[in-house]
Amino acid sequence: MAWWKAWVEQEGVTVKGSPHFNPVPDAETLYKAMKGIGTNEQAIIDVLTRRSSAQRQQIAKSFKAQFGSDLTETLKSELSGKFERLIVALMYPPYRYEAKELHDAMKGLGTKEGVIIEILASRTKNQLQEIMKAYEEDYGSSLEEDIQADTSGYLERILVCLLQGSRDDVTGFVDPGLALQDAQDLYAAGEKICGTDEMKFITILCTRSARHLMRVFEEYEKIANKSIEDSIKSETHGSLEEAMLTIVKCTRNLHCYFAERLHYAMKGAGTLDGTLIRNIVSRSEIDLNLIKGHYKKMYGKTLSSMIMEDTSGDYKNALLSLVGSDP
């Protein structure tokens, strides 16, 4: 399933919210869970992981009206560590959360280029526009300008090009002649010459629709006798290679891409908690069920079982509640 279909898949949602929702008792439950000495973490998990993002915003308003305190700030003061990070992530509206992740990836020394690539390469034109709007509202600066200031070279160019959101095309029309020409141009820009015309790769990967690119990849393999992925690996390196490969992966199958990201976060020693939290939170109301299905096919085990092996305590319980039952 490629990325252009992923946002109409209602069966992919793991967090659907409460059908008989009332923010008043939910806010009261959270207040009692954090009142006095100690915290009832399970009560917090039961409420916040089983409500939709829109419902959580209503709970926050009710909490403020009833108790005069900001719910997110109260949660920050009562919780700690990875569990706090996860619960606080749930309190952000989706686009504001992704704007925050992008801002955090660029603030301070160093840049988390993988986070920026992941978000920009996997979102639709409309989603990117909402993220850019939220970013400017929350941080008082342009996302595009901040990316330009924080990155350089061909990586900067591909990220800015992705922000333009030119890839979306739901009409389904593909011009076979143009697809063949693009494939020939990619071959001429890489495998056929000494060196690489990076801008030709960037232009085609960032401005063509997903359906069109799928046809380009087919034609390219016929011409080059190798996949577009193999050519990218041999012609580029570093963050530019990662960005190009991410575009290709998201074009071929978005759900497989996110399954791979989740596995990458948990494989080996240690856990990349930022990647794990971001992808589970951001996909839970979109297509996490579909991602779970692909995860099991790709790695021979369920996402839930991997979370159980790799995390612990309230953090683990909250993640499992968001992920839901296994397919």
Curated annotation (Swiss-Prot):
Residues reported to bind Ca(2+): M266, G268, G270, D310
Key word Calcium present: yes
Highest taxon of source: Eukaryota
Coiled coil: none
Keywords: Annexin, Blood coagulation, Calcium, Calcium/phospholipid-binding, Hemostasis, Metal-binding, Repeat
Classification via SUPFAM superfamilies: Annexin
Pfam families reported for this sequence: Annexin
Database matches in PROSITE patterns: ANNEXIN_1, ANNEXIN_2
InterPro entries referenced in this protein's UniProt entry, alphabetically: Annexin, Annexin_repeat, Annexin_repeat_CS, Annexin_sf, ANX8
Annexin repeats by residue range: 21-92, 93-164, 177-249, 253-324
SMART domains linked: ANX
Annotated GO MF terms: calcium ion binding; calcium-dependent phospholipid binding; phosphatidylserine binding
Keyword Repeat: yes
One GO term of the biological process aspect: endosomal transport
GO cellular component: cytoplasm; nucleus; plasma membrane; vesicle membrane
Reported function: This protein is an anticoagulant protein that acts as an indirect inhibitor of the thromboplastin-specific complex, which is involved in the blood coagulation cascade.
Similarity-based family: Belongs to the annexin family.
Domain notes: A pair of annexin repeats may form one binding site for calcium and phospholipid.
Protein name: Annexin A8
Source organism of the structure: Oryctolagus cuniculus
